[in-house]
Amino acid sequence: MNTNLAREEVVDVVDNVIPNIHALENTEVSNENILKRQSPYRYIKRFMDVILATIALVVLSPIFLIIAIAIKIESKGPVFFKHTRIGKNGKIIKLYKFRSMVINAEELIKSFTPEQMKEYKENYKLTNDPRITKIGKFLRKTSLDELPQLLNIIKGDLSIIGPRPVVTDELKKYGANTEKFLSVTPGLTGYWAANGRSCTTYEQRMQMELYYIDNLSLKMDIKVFF
């Protein structure tokens, strides 16, 4: 893809979901106000999370089985993968995912080219990651690799809608907004994930996640979901 065209696409996506992204840098909603707003909202949201996640697990159980078989056929190793993330109030959580990489994925980071390493350090992912299996590419493209996180929702680690959980190095990028980011339960999907997940910079991702938190409401969740 032409570099200039790619940049234009990023700008278009962000401008469409946040009319004036630069204005967000000066938008401050106190953590106290966010917590007050969560009081009735969080109980309704938690109830809906448990009900919808339980129904989804039952309905999607045949798909779970098909994916598990496909993973085992293509490569040796476990079907599921647990990834450490930071949840609400800084709690360490283990997210469940269908394994989409080869089993020695961490070791292969050492063989990245300088360009790949630069991209990985900046975005915590690669556009064309050589460690991803064939079935893994399909699972990631369709987000089916994250279906096991329905279990995390039932446990209370995640909500259906919320900022995507991050690792420690990513959290550092939030700087003065770290406390605000950690004040809400992370989600299976969210405002950023639904509106430009694959074509935004990390700075734009953070602004979109904080925009969601500043506008926390059932109305916002419905907007993201649909």
Question: Residue ranges of each PLM-predicted region?
Answer:
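C-terminal terminal-structure detector
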Residues: 2-13, 39, 127, 177-226
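N-terminal hydrophobic signal-anchor/signal peptide
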Residues: 1-58, 179
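A short, structured surface patch at a secondary-structure boundary
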Residues: 122-184, 225
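Short, glycine-rich, amphipathic interfacial segments at transmembrane boundaries or analogous
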Residues: 18, 81-130, 189-209
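Hydrophobic alpha-helical segments characteristic of transmembrane helices
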Residues: 18-26, 147-153, 194
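Short glycine/proline-rich turn/loop motifs
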Residues: 28-38, 114-119, 129-132
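Acidic active-site catalytic centers that drive phospho-/nucleotidyl reactions
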Residues: 49, 145-149, 209, 221
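A hydrophobic, helix-centered structural microdomain
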Residues: 36-107, 218, 223-226
